[in-house]
Amino acid sequence: GLANSSTVTRGRLSGFGGAPNMGHDPHGRRHATPAWLNMITEPDPMQRGKKLVVQMVETFQAGVKPTFVETLDAVEVAKTSGMPLAPVLIYGDDVTHVLTEEGIAYLYRAESLEERRAMVAAVAGITDIGLGVDAKRVAALRQSGKVVYPE
């Protein structure tokens, strides 16, 4: 429910393709781009922007398998294969937006881990994660513009 993702699933261990480019964490930036600047949430000359990392997924995969889960399959794969860490492609705290057929969650605007989880749930449809969020909470997130549904 925190927007972590991996290409590793039970029965399938695939590579990360171009994702190793995500493997660095540079906080400094010589030339700010408009997209990078748009990720700034507080007016402060020392505030930093953020790389846009947008997850675009359907709430369910083939075979009615939910995309949004509490624990990635990669965690179990790591345990059973003796890996020291789960092979996570992108950690949720790097994800700025989650876009599904339900709507978009502007995760970079979350003010807490709890709010981030609620924002993911708000666009997770009828998955267990999506059904775990209160309708009043979703309404408040929509009112604040942190979650937007198609009209």
Where are these regions (language model features)?
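Conserved phosphate- and dinucleotide-binding cores of soluble alpha/beta proteins
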Residues: G1-E151
